[in-house]
Swiss-Prot record:
The gene is Aass. Pathway: Amino-acid degradation; L-lysine degradation via saccharopine pathway; glutaryl-CoA from L-lysine: step 1/6; Amino-acid degradation; L-lysine degradation via saccharopine pathway; glutaryl-CoA from L-lysine: step 2/6. Residues 28-455 are annotated as: Lysine-ketoglutarate reductase. L-saccharopine binds at residues 577-578, 604, 703, 724-726. Bifunctional enzyme that catalyzes the first two steps in lysine degradation. This is Alpha-aminoadipic semialdehyde synthase, mitochondrial. In the N-terminal section; belongs to the AlaDH/PNT family. It comes from Mus musculus (Mouse). Signal peptide: none annotated.
Amino acid sequence: MLRAQRPRLARLRACLSRGLHHKPVMALRREDVNAWERRAPLAPKHIKGITKLGYKVLIQPSNRRAIHDKEYVRAGGILQEDITEACLILGVKRPPEEKLMSKKTYAFFSHTIKAQEANMNLLDEVLKQEIRLIDYEKMVDHRGSRIVAFGQWAGVAGMINILHGMGLRLLALGHHTPFMHLGMAHNYRNSSQAVQAVRDAGYEISLGLMPKSIGPLTFVFTGTGNVSKGAQEVFNELPCEYVEPHELREVSKTGDLRKVYGTVLSRHHHLVRKTDGVYDPVEYEKYPERYTSRFNTDIAPYTTCLINGIYWEQNTPRLLTRQDAQSLLVPVKSSVVPVEGCPELPHKLVAICDISADTGGSIDFMTECTTIERPFCMYDADQQIIHDSVEGSGILMCSIDNLPAQLPIEATEYFGDMLYPYVEEMLLSDASQPLESQNFSPVVRDAVITSNGLLTDKYKYIQKLRESRERIQFLSMSTKKKVLVLGSGYVSGPVLEYLSRDNNIEITLGSDMTNQMQQLSKKYNINPVSLTVGKQEAKLQSLVESQDLVISLLPYVLHPVVAKACIESRVNMVTASYITPAMKELEKSVDDAGITVIGELGLDPGLDHMLAMETIDTAKELGATVESYVSYCGGLPAPEHSDNPLRYKFSWSPVGVLMNIMQPASYLLNGKVVNVTGGVSFLNSVTPMDYFPGLNLEGYPNRDSIKYAEIYGISSAHTLLRGTLRYKGYSKALNGFVKLGLINREAYPALRPEANPLTWKQLLCDLVGISRSSPCEKLKEVVFTKLGGDNTQLEAAEWLGLLGDEQVPQAESIVDAFSKHLVSKLSYGPEEKDMIVMRDSFGIRHPSGHLENKTIDLVVYGDFNGFSAMAKTVGLPTAMAAKMLLDGEIEAKGLMGPFTKEIYGPILERIKAEGIVFNTQSTIKL
């Protein structure tokens, strides 16, 4: 291998016109970009061969290089710092730009052939210095296969690393395994030592010392190149058996625990045409976009460790997407009763070693390479986040991009053996002469990226790629994502603030409240547009059609109007409000339009759903059953600001709050359906709360709770109730207003602008059926009787001035007028704070028969001179869902609530960073 082929040497020596004393000089530069880069392109034995041919070889001193400088000197190299004498300079990785020397021939891995942005400054400097650059990556044979590469050693090191990582991960899951005795590849002096450690681990496996509860371990190798072969060399030292991909399912369940199983995956094993499920290799090469991968369904569910050695090209199917990872991390129910000290794996797929280190490639969620210093991370698919700990939920990931540097001596010798036959002709390169005058072999000539200050013909495409990328970057910077926010009420502030953190989002705010829009425009970079939804449909439609997303913060009755405009323009939409029957009627139209409309993203509904689904899904994963679910939530004034007859204040329009008590409600209690009629009788359903006793709370059922048995997937629950929390006394006061007819949404002509103004005394006289001219005492007496002799309710009416001469606001209905009046009397002052109180209670029956009583509490206070608690807890989850849609994190289409992990998982995780933190407690009854 060290002797160059005689015909090639004869040809090269014939080209050497200079005398022996003018022979070219070669230099081995030291690696100085990465602390772990201890390799060299040639080993001492190669230097010895070159010096025997009469060439001078300079060795730049390096204490980092794994092979000692003395070894190179013994081989005939000359140790010196100054390498300007050399015409050929060899390295492994790129040199710093400031150390490049003009009109020299350099050979190294430049990582420029795809116009990689990180190395374009290097390429510019190479061109400026008129350097002839030979890139090892492009030294290929007539079939296009690489001749010079470290691939095999990347596979060897990667496999050793992931076995070590699996030992750590399995220990975190409660299992000691023989893999715990393996270290990282660089901890071994050479691969022989590492292999011996693997053999020792394999011996323990063959003795049956693997934990039974984790089942047989399966390893899947993608690709058939040097990377995969190197990884398999290490794997073969274990007691292993190779099976076909279609056999994985069976061996993953019933395989022998005294061995591990492997399969080598080729394209035909998982790629199929979308139309008929057939694989045609010729067609795939031409039209990869016609194909999809079945890896996620046919192979990944039965894989313990994936060793990926393939690169991803645009338009080709990925091996695994983010959504695939979510489904793969769902635990499979076991028929075996779990033992506390011997748990089963939470999911089959434990680890991925992505030796390709291709970020955003065939493994979609591998977005950043790990390093030798920090080799592992965990991808939590539910939360769609990456964290460094080997504990917690997720898949262990290892994606080091310089793996061969962990076994530097053997990697150097291996690489040098392949490079050595071409070194002498590279030595004859004169960078000052035209490339055409050089007598290079095709292998070397076709690897020359630059020469004489220009890109060579074969690589002129790099400049076009750069220009194309720069255009795309410019367009992406100039083409912002457009969001239309409808409504400028209390909730809009947190929504606008959260979205404004991303400079790539352009926000338009549509509202008919000019003053509020102006105030918000001063705080946030938004485009204010005057718009009255419901009366300006054409203007709404023209606004919507230019957007990427619409957020409706309007009253719920207007959401269908907005949704229709979104359907027409095929624009996604989110809202915090309930998915009403009117919205539900649009479900088919939403599906036909292929858009996403997400509702119930606020607090209640919203965060209550998300917490419920997270708890319920977790219980199901454990094989448990949810027997009861009770959730109460309320927006309240802070206790120090609750001194009024309602014990309540309004942070937005009171209409919805008032009308809520007029609605019927139904819930399930101990297996029986309880129906509550709205209006006067709702007071009978009010219950005092025994938690947070210092707050003196009461609660009442909210609308139809029973339907959530199906939505939440807990049809077996005997108790299911969703309710509203208030301070004690609120319900009684509101009940009085119902008796007086003040909570009535029917049209009331006497309150319209064209009618004569009315005082509250006059309106109340009309409502109780006496003359408007009746004296105050008479009205008070009749009202007292109407209220059933309840002094508390009478005092509430008097406190609000309903028996006085204050003018009634103009409105379409009595409840609208009453709402405006309440806003004037019971709005929050500039220094007053609100609070949110929510409690979710679950009864969870575990497979052991134990009953777990679990509570989740949320208490949030408004900020002094900042956002209210209600605005934060409604606006932030809505804004987060909107951002997730814009960023492509939510791919599902249709009308939906936040009932899937894809939606609730990231929101519940991210909202913690905003200071909204939940407190969870559990007690177990034996």
